[in-house]
């Protein structure tokens, strides 16, 4: 009987989990992304078909040239959404009818009618620390298949990596204090709010105000009251009292609706009345440093030494760093618009570049040359390694795919960073919980030299002699 009850409980749990997964799929597929391509992807791919290139195997690298905010590195995010997209990408009758109206030939539309991505995708792990000019993802596929992925892949990686990187910067500035994502209302649309909340958790935020994101991605929710709650009552004390009576385990009171210190007095009165020692007060305006010092003093004098002070109000890593340097007594930060929009540097510049083609089984390197030397690409299908001494990352190595590795000194070890995550129409990468991804990112950050965290140092990317020579020769024509 005990065994039967256990099995029933397990079945109920699995059913509930499946329902959540189906709801996520439903929400994320209500809007069709099949045609989320820059128009030239279709003009080029029709041309590939006409010129006999449709089945030519191509290799594309995705990489970025500089990290946001002058940083030394970024956080890789968005892989799961990319694999979902690639696995399900097809073109239905409605898509084909639209393309027909745009003048595309029937032969090309017939090709698209039977489209399914059959290539391979190599990627770093989601949540990984990534550096400029290194391939973070490699697409190996027929020319048409590879080209049609470009826009969605860049759109996804550029947004989610940007937000994860920004969150990581803010979390590091908070020096162990809780950072909560409060940005939904300032995001650039609903999807940006959802994906941004997910990316922020990967970057180290502990919770989100975004209820739908919490439901879809299994995130911790955060949020208690706005000024409207206080204004709804005849006086502030009654507002606080009513709230704590309803939510005694979530007693965070916003004290700056009228006067911060009168609000604090009312909060202390209510906490005492209900015997709450571990509540919190939130301030959303004014001189946060000065206010926090005075609030902390009054809370301590009232015997509420475990009561937390939460601050919000257009915060980012720079303002948080200044607050803490000036001795602010703040226990946690609610960060909204400057996180969810990456306000200080709102562009993440991943690019998608052809680096090789395969003809009759031979791989031929390709290069894009520019008078701006930093825009000249690194050619060929490549492998990427990170070299460690103990648990500390020393440098990365980039080499041609078939090069023989040189032996390292016994105190060093290599880790290959690019692994196959999609092959033969199927994903090989299992989705991971946000908690798992956040812990991985935290471990990645702990492997970095302290100087990289504040961009006082740069991280070395070593090209193998053969790769360096190849790039030089191709650059010179």
Question: For each of these PLM feature ranges, what is it?
Answer:
Residues 4-6, 14:
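Short hydrophobic targeting helices and cationic amphipathic motifs
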Residues 18-56, 66-68, 103, 109-118, ...:
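Buried, small/hydrophobic-residue-enriched core segments of structured protein domains
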Residues 22-56, 60, 70-74, 300-302, ...:
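Gly/Ser/Thr/Ala-enriched C-terminal appendages of enzymes
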Residues 58-113:
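N-terminal, Lys/Arg-enriched amphipathic/low-complexity engagement segments
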Residues 84-86, 123-126, 130:
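An N-terminal, globular interaction/scaffold subdomain
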Residues 101-109, 189, 366, 399-402:
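Short, positively charged
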Residues 222, 281, 309, 331-333:
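Hydrophobic residues within beta-strands of alpha/beta enzymes
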């Amino acid at each position: 009987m005990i065994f039967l009850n256990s099995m029933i409980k397990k079945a109920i749990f699995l059913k509930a989990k499946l329902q959540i997964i189906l709801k996520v799929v439903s929400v994320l597929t209500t809007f069709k992304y099949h045609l989320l391509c820059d128009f030239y992807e279709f003009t080029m791919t029709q041309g590939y078909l006409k010129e006999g290139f449709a089945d030519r195997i191509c290799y594309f690298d995705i990489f970025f040239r500089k990290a946001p905010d002058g940083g030394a590195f970024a956080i890789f995010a968005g892989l799961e959404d990319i694999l979902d997209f690639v696995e399900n990408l097809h073109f239905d009758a409605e898509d084909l009818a639209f393309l027909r109206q745009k003048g595309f030939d029937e032969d090309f539309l017939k090709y698209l009618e039977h489209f399914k991505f059959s290539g391979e995708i190599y990627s770093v792990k989601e949540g990984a620390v990534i550096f400029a000019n290194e391939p973070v993802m490699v697409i190996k596929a027929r020319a048409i298949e590879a080209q049609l992925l470009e826009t969605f892949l860049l759109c996804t990686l550029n947004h989610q990596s940007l937000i994860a990187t920004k969150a990581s910067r803010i979390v590091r500035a908070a020096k162990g204090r809780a950072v909560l994502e409060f940005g939904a209302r300032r995001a650039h649309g609903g999807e940006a709010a959802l994906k941004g909340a997910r990316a922020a958790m990967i970057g180290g935020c502990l919770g989100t105000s975004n209820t739908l994101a919490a439901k879809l991605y299994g995130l911790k929710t955060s949020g208690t009251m706005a000024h409207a709650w206080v204004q709804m009552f005849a006086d502030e004390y009654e507002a606080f009292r009513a709230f704590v009576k309803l939510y005694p385990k979530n007693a965070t009171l916003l004290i700056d609706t009228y006067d911060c210190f009168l609000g604090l007095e009312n909060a202390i009165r209510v906490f005492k009345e209900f015997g709450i020692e571990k509540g919190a007060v939130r301030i959303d305006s004014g001189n946060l440093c000065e206010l926090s010092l005075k609030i902390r003093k009054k809370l301590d004098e009232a015997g509420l030494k475990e009561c937390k002070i939460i601050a919000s109000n257009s915060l980012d890593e720079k303002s948080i760093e200044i607050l803490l340097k000036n001795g602010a007594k703040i226990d946690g930060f609610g960060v909204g618009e400057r996180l969810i929009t990456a306000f200080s540097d709102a562009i993440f510049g991943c690019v998608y570049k052809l680096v090789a083609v395969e003809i009759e089984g031979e791989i031929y390197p390709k290069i894009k040359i520019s008078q701006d030397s930093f825009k000249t690409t690194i050619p060929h299908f490549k492998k990427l390694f990170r070299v460690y001494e103990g648990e500390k990352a020393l440098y990365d190595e980039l080499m041609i795919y078939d090069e023989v590795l040189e032996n390292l000194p016994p105190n060093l070890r290599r880790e290959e960073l690019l692994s196959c995550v999609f092959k033969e129409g199927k994903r090989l990468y299992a989705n991971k919980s946000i908690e798992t991804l956040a812990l991985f990112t935290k471990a990645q950050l702990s492997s970095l030299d302290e100087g990289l965290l504040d961009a006082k140092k740069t991280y070395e990317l070593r090209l193998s002699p053969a790769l360096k020579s190849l790039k030089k020769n191709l650059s010179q024509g």
